[in-house]
């Protein structure tokens, strides 16, 4: 509702476009294989079934949801967890076969012989290899920290002042932890698009909880003491921390789409695997592809 797109909805591509997007069954159903059980993959599988295509969904982990699992734990984003629950109920009601703990390869796709392969391979946290100590025991990505994959101590430094970093800082402050936020740029949430209402609310919350924010500071090292940071052209100093949470962006996961070139399979890449974006991008990508099969 905030990107000058006219009236729209992040999770309902048909909103205000009902006459354009009809729900008629496909005249020629196609066998669809969806690889990736995040929001884009779940939407693709759901709509494929709705349009009458036989579809199966494959997910490499033991649970569906992808980035929704971590996002649903962030302050002001509890509705994301509810969205994940809703998708899984939809998939169950539509009786879509779901294959968990299954890492799909190009050879597996070729052997399955679908008419359509939807690659919703998602994205992973950027962990800059150039930073000494990035693999230190105290270092953890924001996604792993929020989803509970790794424990987080009582004193936390969050590196990265984008929307996810700010929400991560608030998440742990609300748990009673002592948190500091570090951002390389002169202001937080200044690069990616964040709706003004949400940005202002987050800034107010950070200020209300008196979270120290070190703008124009770069992470130099993660060590036994915590995070070594430095302002421009000044001496570095250490912020002591039990855990250093790194939130400096996402990168699309590797794709095997090129290995399917030359087959008769229609191949589409959707969601964060095609371009790192948000729920709106993932859902609308999936819907557009399935609608036009």
Label the predicted regions.
Residues 3-7, 119-138:
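Positively charged, proline/Ser/Thr-rich regional signature most characteristic
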Residues 1-29:
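Cysteine-cluster motifs in flexible loop/terminal segments that predominantly coordinate metals
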Residues 73-77, 117, 135-137, 197-200, ...:
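Short, hinge-like loop/turn segments at secondary-structure boundaries
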Residues 54-94, 171-217, 274:
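Rossmann-like dinucleotide-binding cores of NAD(P)H-dependent redox enzymes
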Residues 26-60, 64, 99-113, 121-131, ...:
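Rossmann-like dinucleotide/flavin-binding elements
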Residues 84, 100-103, 141-143, 215-217, ...:
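Short loop/edge segments at beta-strand edges and connector loops
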Residues 91-98, 135-138, 206-212, 263-266:
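A short helix-to-beta-strand connector/capping loop
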